[in-house]
Amino acid sequence: MPDIKLGSLFDGIGVFPLAASRCGIRPVWASEIEKAPISITKRHFPDMVHLGDITKVDGGKIPPVHIITFGSPCQNLSLIGNRSGLAGAKSSLFYQAFRIIQEMRDATDNLYPAIAVWENGSYVLKCIRRVMNRNQLCIAPP
């Protein structure tokens, strides 16, 4: 099996890396700022590099990965949130993931990442189509 590598943004407790590792995919790095979740991820993946604050990560300078996963903050997207969408103070961090993906693509001649997986609430479908089209990215049909 090829060595498929994964990077996780807004990593939390490392659910994406854990699931991926059970499928033979190797988690390489993660970005998270909360200490408690990082301690859990370090226990499961002691060799995974922790990049810290997503706003300070340069996607062109980190190790390229085949897959980038992210579950950006949903406070402004959720049913109980204020529904200000991707313009909201917390949910707008979503754009940091897109920036990192684009920086990595630019640095690798569009080879990496091959796949980006975003997890969030159902309201996000109303916000995302415009962003995906603007960035020439595909989206699964509803």
What are these regions, as identified by a protein language model?
Residues 1-142:
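Conserved active-site and SAM-binding loop architecture
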